[in-house]
């Protein structure tokens, strides 16, 4: 299960951060004594924002509603909520749409500007990294374009930029950036 794997990763291998799909998985790890930073990659309903803050989790954000809920929950707790912003570079699932880098950068900057949030990272996910190299590289370029717009227009940079999951870790070292998943 997840708990023995997380313990081995944290206590024996010393990984910097863990990532899970949902709040329930993160809560299970915290309950088991895992203290490493945990990033929730999936969506969390805004009504559970206080749980994210109370457990000291980092939440993926791609909607104003969730960003506002996290900001309010963190403010009420006297804390800052760690967030990673999701950029949709072609998966067509979640995130600021990168096919318009200026618009995506504006949307992301507005989310980051909310009080009581601590923007730690930004990421995308490749649709077919184990298949279509051309499309994977197009997605990577789109992601870099959004990052460039964020820095040039808003002076915003991120400590952690990531996009490489399993297939990209093996096939595309140039996509590793600051973290792999």
Region locations from a protein language model:
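N-terminal active-site wall of soluble small-molecule enzyme domains
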Residues: 1-57, 61-70
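Active-site loop/helix belt of alpha/beta enzymes
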Residues: 1-13, 68, 72-73, 79-82, ...
């Amino acid at each position: 299960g997840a708990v023995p794997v997380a313990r081995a990763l944290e206590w024996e291998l010393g990984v910097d951060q863990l990532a899970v799909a949902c709040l329930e998985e993160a809560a299970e790890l915290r309950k088991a004594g895992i203290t490493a930073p945990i990033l929730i990659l999936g969506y969390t309903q805004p009504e559970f924002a206080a749980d994210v803050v109370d457990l000291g989790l980092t939440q993926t954000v791609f909607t104003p509603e969730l960003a506002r809920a996290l900001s309010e929950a963190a403010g009420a707790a006297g804390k800052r909520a760690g967030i990673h912003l999701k950029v949709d570079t072609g998966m067509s699932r979640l995130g600021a749409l990168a096919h318009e880098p200026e618009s995506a950068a504006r949307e992301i900057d507005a989310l980051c500007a909310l009080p009581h949030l601590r923007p730690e990272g930004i990421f995308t996910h490749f649709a077919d990294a184990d298949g279509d190299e051309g499309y994977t590289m197009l997605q990577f370029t789109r992601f870099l374009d959004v990052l460039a717009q964020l820095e040039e227009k808003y002076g915003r940079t991120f400590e952690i930029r990531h996009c490489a999951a399993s297939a990209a870790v093996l096939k595309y070292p140039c996509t590793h950036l600051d973290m792999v998943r």
